[in-house]
């Protein structure tokens, strides 16, 4: 609106419209009109009596076109970049060629733009970074090889990756250049001059001298391919499990390596704001933007799974070679029985580790199969360049337990050459392309609000001053410089939040359009149900067949660290940790185990919330304990500072706010004032009138609904309009409160109907989930069994 109001101040937005109405096939645009007819059209320079205009979003930014016949053949008016990244890309060195280096070595004829840029970069000590934005399949790997072949003074190189598959692929391409893969090495890696290493293992390149000072190499060159994926990896839960370093400290160690290195090379198909911030942190840079479009793909979205599978299987029956890109590994498990007797390969996190080794020569390996399927375990690092696959099919999934829309396009891009450029995609969620999505400013505002609520710092370099008056302590922010880590984390949170079901297609559509591809919809009002396949064995049934007691878990953990696990051994570990998380003692009763797994496998987060909120876990996580910590506004360092610096981790901050919202809900419903609750504190029956009063009180007075826009992301809720507080919207408020409490293992539900004063009305119950409590009590030694699953839980 800022762009268009510059030319038409009285503009009104009318939504997104399909372009075929105006003979603009496969184009979607933003439609506008304006009321002041004296405003001059910026395209023709004349005033129109009635026509409106539209704006198209492209990979180059926003362009305005007018509906008037006088403007029909005139050039579109460029309005500006679609976001801050567009300006960053627009200011780069622009090229448009199939390969970054078309012919010859760096110093060889013919003269080429990228060759000159590389020579300038490596000969100028003042230019730290070369950043290359170029589509997949345009020779980024070849360009790096030519750099290493030409410059023999680049001896010490650190190549940072974020996926084991990427590390394998890089090693396969560069082992002849003297690189070693961290996955093949034991112990400390300080002595290796050319090293490929995953972010998670960066601590292995540091050593300590006799005085316990940290020592690491000064590298001639640090390379980060797939820079956007690397930045997003700092959201990984596996990094948070590191007992030696916090995620923030791991990030700082990476910065130290890069800051002291002589040169930095970063590459990706789509450099975003995370990349820009990262690049700018190290001083002067040269950015190259390759505008070449290898294959223009058409993503066709259907919500009919039955039809999707019929078309897929028909293509396979006709002998076509197909690739199935799935955001859900479990969907591939369901598909696998349909491939019986065919040549196929499936890559998921549960696949045999030997398959990872095959990816070093993927162009040879995948050609053996008619069908290739993979989950987000292959997001990057695999470049299949052969003419082999006729079609790609995509299974899309939203939510926090899968990859982002950006990662999906990375997955699709693994296949460089494709017989049919139309990609059929199944998606069961909403298909609106104009949803209100989360932005950087949204997430920044939320974290600022969480700091205020918790009284603890979340974003680094935010300085507070402590004021004490009338026995109350007030923390006021006096400066607000955000560290690079926090900037990038906020962008990561934006990407994560926009995986919400209502925003998923909107974000995917924008990314597809910006990449020069298109999206079309072929949805039906009532999709056919897929008939259950009796040949499919559920994942729970597969786990039940495994006797984990026959394996030594410590040996499997050692094999896991060396990437030597078989598929069966991975399932053993999965079952072992599932049982450990829930406190299951005995899985010999297979039927009971299957029932338990199907019921609770997807509720680990609910159990985590339940244990923390009701005080089963470390008491330092409770709300009461948080109140008494003063170290966060002083110069003191807390004890055990190796993993917990003076800042709250971002997730800890969100958990603390969630807990306070739950306490606030319960206090308002029960009309009490408590700082926290134990599992014995809930067990109430409310009359109809008490229930009605409670829900309206929560709607009117709770901290959640007072700042709903700030708190919705905490509970995976989408942005949108707020509901007025009235009887008409009563069900909405009750449904929201019920769902939020349920995410903590607290039940608030309608019970039996009773006659009260000659009228029939319902009772309402507020209590902890008995089954969840029984399981948690057993795990913490507070009970001897779980009534519903006595064979799994016994002493």
Curated annotation (Swiss-Prot):
The yes or no answer to whether the keyword RNA-binding is present is: no
Keywords linked to the UniProt accession: ATP-binding, Helicase, Hydrolase, Nucleotide-binding
- The top EC class is hydrolase
Signal sequence coordinates: none
Any Pfam family the entry gives: Herpes_ori_bp
| EC number(s) from the headed UniProt entry | 3.6.4.-
Cite a single GO BP annotation. Answer: DNA replication
The reply on keyword Hydrolase is yes
**Which residues make up the binding site for ATP?**
134-141
Q: Name one GO molecular function term.
A: helicase activity
- Using the record's annotation, list all stretches that form the Helicase ATP-binding domain: 121-289
Q: Which Gene3D superfamilies match?
A: P-loop containing nucleotide triphosphate hydrolases (3.40.50.300)
Its biological purpose: Probably involved in DNA replication. May bind the genome origin of replication (ori).
Q: Which family does it belong to?
A: Belongs to the mimivirus R1 family.
Name assigned to this protein: Putative replication origin-binding protein
Organism, scientific name: Acanthamoeba polyphaga mimivirus
């Amino acid at each position: 609106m800022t762009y268009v109001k510059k030319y038409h101040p009285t503009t009104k937005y009318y939504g997104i419209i399909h372009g075929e109405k105006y003979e603009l096939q496969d184009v979607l645009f933003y439609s506008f009109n304006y009321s002041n007819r004296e405003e001059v059209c910026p395209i023709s320079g004349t005033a129109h009596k009635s026509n409106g205009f539209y704006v198209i979003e492209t990979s180059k930014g926003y362009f305005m076109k007018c509906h008037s016949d006088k403007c029909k053949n005139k050039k579109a008016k460029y309005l500006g970049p679609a976001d801050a990244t567009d300006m960053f890309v627009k200011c780069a060195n622009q090229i448009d060629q199939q390969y970054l280096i078309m012919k010859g070595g760096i110093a060889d004829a013919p003269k080429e733009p990228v060759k000159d840029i590389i020579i300038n970069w490596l000969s100028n000590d003042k230019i730290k970074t070369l950043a290359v934005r170029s589509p997949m399949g345009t020779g980024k790997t070849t360009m790096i090889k030519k750099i290493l072949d030409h410059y023999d003074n680049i001896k010490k190189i650190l190549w940072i990756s974020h996926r084991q598959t990427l590390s394998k692929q890089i090693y396969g391409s560069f082992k002849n250049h003297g690189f070693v893969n961290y996955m093949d090495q034991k112990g400390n890696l300080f002595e290796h001059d050319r090293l490929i290493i995953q972010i998670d293992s960066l601590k292995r390149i540091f050593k300590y001298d006799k005085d316990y000072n940290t020592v690491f190499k000064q590298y001639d060159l640090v390379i980060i391919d797939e820079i956007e994926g690397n930045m997003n990896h700092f959201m990984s839960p596996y990094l948070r499990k590191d007992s030696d370093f916090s995620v923030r400290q791991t990030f700082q160690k990476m910065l130290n390596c890069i800051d002291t290195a002589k040169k930095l090379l970063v590459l990706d198909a789509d450099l975003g704001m995370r990349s820009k911030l990262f690049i700018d942190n190290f001083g002067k840079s040269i950015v190259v933007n390759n505008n070449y479009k290898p294959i223009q793909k058409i993503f066709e979205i259907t919500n009919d799974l039955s039809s999707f599978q019929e078309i897929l299987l028909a293509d396979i029956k006709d002998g076509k070679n197909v690739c199935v890109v799935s955001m859900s590994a479990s969907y591939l498990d369901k598909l696998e029985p349909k491939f019986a007797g065919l040549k196929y390969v499936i890559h998921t996190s549960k696949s045999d580790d030997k398959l990872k080794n095959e990816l070093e020569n993927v162009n040879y390996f995948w050609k053996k199969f008619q069908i290739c399927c993979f989950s987000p375990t292959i997001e990057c690092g695999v470049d299949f360049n052969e003419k082999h696959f006729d079609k790609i099919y995509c299974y899309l999934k939203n939510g926090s337990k899968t990859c982002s829309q950006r990662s999906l396009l990375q997955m699709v891009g693994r296949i460089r050459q494709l017989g049919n450029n139309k990609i059929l995609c199944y998606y069961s969620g909403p298909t609106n392309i104009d949803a209100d999505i989360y932005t950087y400013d949204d997430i920044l505002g939320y974290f600022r609000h969480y700091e205020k609520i918790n009284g603890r710092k979340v974003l680094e370099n935010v300085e507070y001053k402590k004021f004490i008056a009338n026995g109350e302590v007030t923390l006021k922010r006096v400066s607000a410089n955000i560290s690079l880590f926090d900037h990038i984390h906020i962008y990561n949170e934006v990407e994560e939040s926009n995986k919400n079901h209502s925003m998923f297609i909107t974000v995917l559509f924008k990314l597809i359009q910006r990449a020069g591809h298109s999206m079309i919809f072929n949805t039906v009002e009532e999709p056919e149900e897929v008939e259950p396949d009796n040949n499919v064995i559920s994942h729970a049934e597969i786990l039940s067949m495994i006797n984990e007691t026959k394996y030594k878990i410590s040996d499997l953990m050692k094999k896991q660290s060396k990437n030597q696990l078989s598929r069966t051994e991975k399932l053993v570990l999965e079952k072992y940790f599932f049982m450990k998380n829930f406190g299951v003692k005995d899985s010999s009763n297979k039927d009971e185990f299957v029932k338990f797994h199907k019921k609770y496998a997807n509720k680990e987060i609910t159990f985590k919330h339940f244990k923390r909120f009701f005080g089963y876990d470390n008491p330092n996580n409770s709300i009461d304990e948080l109140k008494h910590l003063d170290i966060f506004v002083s110069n003191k360092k807390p004890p055990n500072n190796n993993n917990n610096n003076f800042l709250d981790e971002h997730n800890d901050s969100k958990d603390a706010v969630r807990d306070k919202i739950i306490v606030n809900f319960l206090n308002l419903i029960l009309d009490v004032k408590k700082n926290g609750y134990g599992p014995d504190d809930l067990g109430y029956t409310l009359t109809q009138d008490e229930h009605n009063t409670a829900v309206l009180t929560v709607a009117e007075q709770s901290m959640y609904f007072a700042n709903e826009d700030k708190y919705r992301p905490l509970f995976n809720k989408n942005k949108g309009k707020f509901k007025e507080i009235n009887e008409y919207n009563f069900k909405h408020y009750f449904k929201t409160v019920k769902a939020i409490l349920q995410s903590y293992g607290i039940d608030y539900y309608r019970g039996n109907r009773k006659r009260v004063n000659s009228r029939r009305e319902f009772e309402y119950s507020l209590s902890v989930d008995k089954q969840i409590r029984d399981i948690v009590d057993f795990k913490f030694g507070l009970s001897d069994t779980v009534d519903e699953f006595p064979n799994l839980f016994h002493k």
